[in-house]
Amino acid sequence: LLLSQSKDLIDRMIKDNNKIVQFSCFPLLYQINYFDRQWAEERMINLFKLDIRMVGVMYSRNYLLQMYNEYPQDVLQIINTCFMSQDKRLIEIGGYAIGELYITKDEFKDTIINIKMMNKNQKNAIVHMAVCYLNVPEYRNKSKEIILRYIRFSDQISYPMWNIFRDNMLDLESDS
């Protein structure tokens, strides 16, 4: 009974024109996700499509990536919208997601290789995610490929590359 009442309340909140009310749905959706995943995910996707800024809500990118297998077209569209946004935070979220989906699922290949069409924030977000995956053995080579390509073809990378050396992510013998 409580779950169905909560769902009714959330559906009304999503239809509300007040963005703050819509924004406040996310903590509730995160909890309902444990009981009725499909229902919660459909509402999250709907909210992202209603207002792309909702992707900026804490943990939304993680949920968005988890929804990829079930709703790939919706997720790819939402991520691309973030990446092409004028909002720096959304560009960063979109870039992180593009980097991660390219590295783990081979999505966004055309975007990744089209460095000249990207702005500085887009490039830095993708490189940042590639650096994060350097420590994952199965994705290490793909991560190195991205980092090298972006360093070679762009002078706009401002990600602190010294972190790679400080955190022992590269081995001078095996990675030379």
Predicted regions and their residues:
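Non-catalytic all-alpha helical scaffold/repeat segments
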Residues: 1-176
